[in-house]
A protein has these predicted regions:
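Polyanion-engaging groove/track-forming segments
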Residues: 1-734
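Active-site metal-binding core of divalent-cation-utilizing nuclease and nuclease-like domains
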Residues: 737-738
Length: 738
């Protein structure tokens, strides 16, 4: 039996007549298509014409453009990535006048403010009021940026989705769109912005439009409210509830609505994955993810293979952080990683003993190709040699499409993409390729840029994109926010973390639009009153979308702050959390562990005949406190590598002193020789010994021993040598033996 995520019955007439069905987002579209496929009763059937509203707007624009209709054919519709890069470029050019800590974050906020202005004040009144509020510094800056953005769009014939919607709604009666008399269903559009309301009104003037909302109150709905002492307990009980329901009914759609607390969401997803995958009832899930969600807790750049890709790409800068080089040495995503594993470990160990926090690539490449050393890595060395040959092509300014080609070639030199093995890594690579295509297509938005800027833009793009969570119709559990869940149907629903601090959500008005203007237009986030009304409407729709049971919960204490239930759930009957736990058979231990396991202890590894173990009191101390630590440290030599330090570390400084002392006392064989030296002669010999030490350290640490740093270090060593000779001259008679 299939899982029902949408009440399809009211929509069946529209599907039978092959009407155009518009929905707010892809989640509802996927739910409709899955429900229809499960009820079709045949292996072959006609796919309903269901479109998310933004996709339909883009399709209409492309249709008119392909038919050479003005102004559609004269303007290129850009995606969200290109739009963001335009805003980012405008804001970066204004940094000399308006210093900002995070231009990328500012660009996102400014872009969102512009879209809100167009969506909620599309009549033009907002622009007049915006012009009259330029005495406010943030509003004045925003007005200037908007003017530059619009000018850039006119010069390059570009337009974004919100602007193209305003043009489209005035042209829907053209024959090219084939909309006259067509049946159009607007499904589950709750609280659309005024711009969409105007679009729907224009659509209603040329087509047979019907508005359909599928939420309706269930007469037998059971409601409960739970209070828990802390967030961790609340999450665990919610997960136990979902696990129990999935065992009892394999066709139930189980929803968990999380507030916008990122910490709560990450813990919830982690525990859900652990507990549902341990469920004795087989759960068919996508790549070990047993629930559907739109809120991935990891970004694309957080994937190890993508992180290492940027580490390789940043090698084009010449001088690198030593930690980044070590990351490349440890990476399993480069060619030869398995064959040269031991040699690369030795290379990192050598670096941590002898390198500072900065590393010159030419020196590192030379060491990699040292055949007589145990850190000889010819495969990785060949990649660095290819980088040196490619360095000339990484200079100058070029389009993003050109840099995408260089990025692919540079990564290919290291065999990066050839090392992906698992399905998850391959899907991450597919998303990476899509990101490269988006960046290449944004050439008109970013203009001519340097390779360093191109890498920065790509990192921005990958930091914004969440790792894709594909919708799996076989997963029973769905984790959404309130906004994401509105329009779907659930058999059971748990409202998690609905306390008086998180629901309704706090107001977060845009700093770039006048506050009175935002409140007057009822923009989401503009004012607490607006937030309350929006929350009340969304909450009512959500409650009417549940057919069997609705649970709501909150925890009473967050650090030292006391929390109360949200006013929206205060009238839910309060249930005993302990009783709820007993009813669902919860246990404190991890599910699935019901018996003690017997494990055979492996015998200790015998010492080889040539193996020597060193250790003093620390060996005895480690053995008594933790035998494993003693084995790891003294037998396996498994100790943490030395940390890289800025400048010279204490070990390098000590080496310099030892070299200087060795040279100094090569000509002093006894105390009598030392006492016989005049002050001038002592200074001369100290200077000569210091020069030898500085020459040695300069050859070993060329990046650190800059002229100024060498001058400071030379003065330090020279002073120590003079003081050392004074102390030695006060000792009793001695003779230098060695």
């Amino acid at each position: 039996m299939s899982i029902n995520r949408f009440k399809l019955q009211p929509l069946l007439p529209a599907i039978e007549q092959n009407a155009l069905i518009l929905v707010p987002n892809h989640r509802i579209r996927d739910a409709i298509l899955c429900s229809h496929a499960s009820q079709a009763g045949a292996t072959v059937f006609r796919t309903p014409r269901v479109f998310a509203i933004d996709i339909w707007i883009r399709d209409m624009w492309e249709l008119a453009s392909n038919r050479a209709l003005a102004p559609f054919c004269n303007l290129q519709l850009i995606d969200a990535v290109a739009e963001h890069f335009i805003w980012l470029g405008i804001i970066e050019r204004s940094l000399s006048e308006l210093p900002l800590l995070n231009p990328d974050q500012t660009a996102r906020a400014v872009g969102q403010s512009y879209r809100s202005l167009k969506q909620w004040l599309s009549s033009g009144d907002g622009h007049r009021e915006l012009a009259g509020a330029t005495a406010i510094p943030d509003v004045a800056a925003f007005s200037n940026w908007v003017e530059q953005y619009q000018q850039y769009g006119e010069e390059n014939q570009l337009i974004n989705l919100v602007d193209c919607t305003q043009i489209l709604l005035a042209a829907l009666d053209r024959p090219a769109f084939n909309l006259v008399g067509e049946a159009v269903y607007l499904v589950n559009f709750y609280q659309p912005p005024p711009l969409y309301q105007q679009l729907f009104a224009s659509l209603d003037a040329v087509a047979a439009v019907q508005v359909l909302q599928t939420s309706e109150a269930a007469p037998a709905l059971v409601r409960h409210r739970f209070e828990f002492p802390d967030q961790a307990t609340e999450i665990l009980r919610c997960v136990e509830w979902a696990r129990t329901l999935s065992r009892a009914d394999s066709a139930a759609h189980i929803g968990i609505i999380s507030n916008r607390d990122e910490t709560q969401l990450k813990q919830l997803q982690r525990i859900l994955k652990r507990e549902l995958l341990a469920n004795p009832v087989p759960i068919r899930a996508n790549d070990g993810n047993p629930f559907n969600s739109s809120q991935a807790d990891l970004k694309l750049i957080d994937a190890g293979i993508i992180h290492d890709a940027f580490a390789l790409l940043n090698l084009g800068r010449g001088i690198q952080d030593s930690d980044d080089i070590c990351r490349i040495l440890r990476s399993p995503f480069t060619d030869g990683a398995e064959e040269e594993k031991e040699a690369r470990i030795q290379m990192e160990s050598f670096m941590r003993r002898n390198f500072g926090n900065r590393c010159q690539l030419s020196e590192f490449s030379r060491l990699l190709n040292s055949q007589s050393r145990d850190y000889y890595c010819p495969v990785l060395g060949a990649g660095f040699a290819g980088l040196a040959r490619r360095a000339r092509s990484l200079k100058g300014l070029a389009s993003s499409a050109f840099w995408v080609g260089q990025i692919a070639a540079l990564l290919a030199d290291f065999g990066w993409q050839q090392t992906a093995r698992g399905k998850l890594e391959l899907e991450i690579l597919d998303q990476w390729q899509e990101a490269l295509e988006l960046f290449a297509n944004a050439s008109v938005a970013v203009g001519k840029i340097s390779f360093a800027t191109a890498l920065s833009r790509m990192q921005t793009l990958c930091a914004q994109q969440a790792q894709r969570l594909k919708f799996d119709p076989r997963c029973q559990v769905s984790v959404y926010s309130v906004t994401e869940a509105v329009g779907l149907s659930f058999d059971h629903l748990w409202l998690l973390g609905f306390d008086d601090r998180h629901w309704p959500e706090a107001a977060s008005p845009s700093p770039y639009l006048p506050y009175d203007l935002q409140k007057q237009a009822a923009m989401p986030g503009s004012h607490s009153e607006v937030q309350f009304e929006l929350a009340r409407a969304s909450f009512a729709v959500l409650c009417n979308s549940v057919s069997q049971s609705l649970c709501a919960s909150h925890h009473c204490l967050d650090a030292e702050q006391q929390l109360s239930p949200s006013s929206f759930i205060a009238d839910f009957p309060l249930a005993d959390a302990a009783l709820h736990r007993r009813e669902h058979g919860a246990t404190d231990g991890k599910p699935g562990i019901e018996a003690t396991l017997s494990i055979e202890d492996l015998p200790g590894l015998a010492l080889r005949s040539d193996e020597q173990i060193r250790g003093g009191s620390s060996l005895i101390s480690n053995q008594s406190s933790c035998p494993f630590r003693a084995f790891a440290v003294h037998r396996l030599a498994a100790v943490a590598g030395a940390q890289f330090e800025a400048g010279l570390n204490s070990r390098a400084r000590g080496t310099g002193i030892h070299v200087a002392l060795e040279n100094l006392f090569a000509g002093i064989q006894s105390r009598s020789d030392l006492v016989a030296l005049s002050p001038a002669e002592r200074r001369r010999r100290a200077s000569a010994a210091t020069a030898v030490a500085m020459e040695t350290m300069g050859a070993k640490y060329p990046l650190v021993m800059t002229p100024k740093f060498a001058e400071i270090e030379s003065e330090r060593i020279n002073t120590l040598l003079l003081r050392f000779m004074e102390l030695e001259s006060e000792r009793k008679d001695f003779t230098v033996i060695a």
